[in-house]
UniProtKB/Swiss-Prot annotation:
This is tRNA-2-methylthio-N(6)-dimethylallyladenosine synthase. It comes from Acinetobacter baumannii (strain ACICU). Pfam families: Radical_SAM, TRAM, UPF0004. The gene is miaB. The keyword Nucleotide-binding does not apply. GO terms for cellular component: cytosol. Its EC number is 2.8.4.3. Residues 178-410 form the Radical SAM core domain.
């Protein structure tokens, strides 16, 4: 099996002009759609697909202004209690807009929608549609149903709530994705089957289901043809991908990476979010074999204490995690590592936290998504006794974030004098002679160059550190277009 099977006929290098920008409008005669996205990159991807879907089916175009929208959609996150309460706070503001414009349609999707269902309408009865992550492709039909029953008496109206977990069918009904620059997210699987004791994802997005291999490769090949040069593969447990092949076999995540790397035009590969249990030797080998793999990895560990990991039901030890990172850094010594940390998990002792803090220092993390533990209803951890005072949890969190911030500063400073491979993305807003791009480690890199280089990769020597995430440099080599 080769990747050529999945590349559209006539695929070729795309010029800068093939990359379309987001469609926004101020024309009052055009139907307008506003989407608020909360949470993870999966939600970002889903929101883009909602816009594609309603644009294709009903002619809606995106607006940045909710006050001028005909439809307001909220793509929600339930990973933490604060995020969930933010949903109803924002809906309260949207209620005022609906009072001013009774024809305004309000829809709630994402994980809070999946978790709460029609309870959302009980608390916010002005919400017209509720849909889950796996049913967003049914939005056009739900919208039609809404308009068809607008004039009906309230008692005759059907509640428009669809939060089911059908087989991974939504991708069969989504239009071709719109391209917005030289980077793109591609969702390759949905859900998670790990059932960590703190996590709502298996309950809000369902069990792990992988997209068929040919669907994934065809989407990526189509994006490459339109000028996309960097692909980020998405999934709640992305390295657990097990996609069915057209021959009836199963493609693993490392095998998928190797096939994607063969697609003309794709010069850089990222992925998120992964689980340590399935961060295999085969996956690590891809970092040695595939130059498209970036030297940046987000691998959530959640805690540096084995006792806490056991309570979290992570099913691995700290030594397992350390061993995998050691193997990876033997291949890529410059690997930048980020992770997730939950601080103040029920039962976390001072000793447990000290272990976590030392672990963070030892592994030299570049970045983290770190939060104080938030109890989520229906999860096993919600029944655990929690005796740690909130102020102690916040103090611990501050220590973690300070250690990681200092490590990040040091890693940025260490870039001085080094050569970075940069994807050139745009002209600077401040100076038309300055180009802006992204390094493997996600830092923004600016340098003097020509706008015709946009969309290509370049080797840049870093000459000045400006901020934590911004560096200056000089061009050493402009790579040919990778298409």
């Amino acid at each position: 099996m080769t990747v050529q099977t999945f590349i559209p006929n006539g695929a070729k290098a795309a010029s800068e002009n093939t990359v379309t920008q987001p469609t926004h409008t101020t024309d009052v005669s055009i139907k307008k759609l506003y989407i608020e996205t909360q949470g993870c990159q999966m939600n970002e991807y889903d929101s883009h697909r909602m816009a594609d879907l309603l644009g294709d089916s009903h002619g809606y175009v995106l607006t940045n202004n909710p006050n001028e929208a005909d439809i307001l959609l909220m793509n929600t996150c339930s990973i933490r209690e604060k995020a969930q309460e933010k949903v109803f706070s924002e809906l309260g503001r949207w209620r005022k807009l609906k009072e001013q414009n009774p024809d305004l349609v309000i829809g709630v999707g994402g994980c809070v929608a999946s978790q709460e269902g029609d309870n959302i309408q009980k608390r916010a009865p002005y919400v017209d549609m509720i849909f889950g992550p796996q049913t967003l492709h049914r939005l056009p039909q739900m919208l039609d149903q809404h308009h068809a029953q607008v004039e009906k008496p309230k008692k005759e109206k059907i509640k428009l709530v669809d939060i089911s977990f059908p087989d991974i069918e939504k991708f069969d009904f989504l239009p071709e994705p719109r391209v917005e620059g030289f980077k793109a997210f591609v969702s390759i699987m949905e859900g998670c089957s790990k059932y960590c004791s703190f996590c709502v994802v298996p309950y809000t997005r369902g069990e792990e289901v992988s997209r068929p291999l040919d669907d994934v490769l065809a989407e990526i090949a189509g994006l490459a043809e339109k000028g996309v040069r960097e692909i980020s593969l998405l999934g709640q447990n992305v390295n657990g991908y097990r996609g069915e092949t057209f021959e009836g076999g199963i493609c693993t995540f490392p095998e998928l990476l190797r096939l994607v790397a063969e697609i003309p035009g794709i010069g850089r590969l990222r992925y998120t979010t992964s689980h340590p249990l399935e961060f295999s030797d085969e996956l690590i080998q891809c970092y040695e074999d595939l130059p498209q793999m970036v030297s940046h990895l987000h691998l959530p560990v959640q805690s540096g204490s084995n006792d806490v990991l056991k309570a979290m039901k992570r099913n691995h030890t700290i030594d397992v995690y350390i061993d995998k990172i050691a193997k990876l850094r033997k291949i890529r010594p410059d690997m930048h590592l980020s992770s997730d940390f939950i601080i103040g998990f029920p039962g976390e002792t001072d000793e447990n936290f000290a272990e976590t803090l030392q672990f963070i220092k030892d592994l030299d993390f570049d970045h983290s998504y770190s939060f104080v533990y938030s109890k989520r209803p229906g999860t096993p951890a919600s029944d655990l006794p929690d005796t740690t005072p909130e102020h102690v949890k916040k103090e611990r969190l501050a220590q973690v974030q300070q250690v990681i911030k200092q490590s990040s500063i040091e890693k940025t400073d260490a870039m001085l004098g080094k050569i970075e491979r940069v994807l050139i993305e745009k002209v600077s807003d401040q100076d038309p002679n300055i180009l802006v791009g992204t390094a493997d480690n996600t830092r923004l890199v600016t340098f003097v160059g020509d706008a015709s280089w946009i969309g290509r990769f370049a080797e840049i020597e870093i000459t000045e550190i400006k901020t934590l995430n911004l560096v200056y440099g000089e061009l050493l080599n402009l790579e040919p277009d990778v298409a």
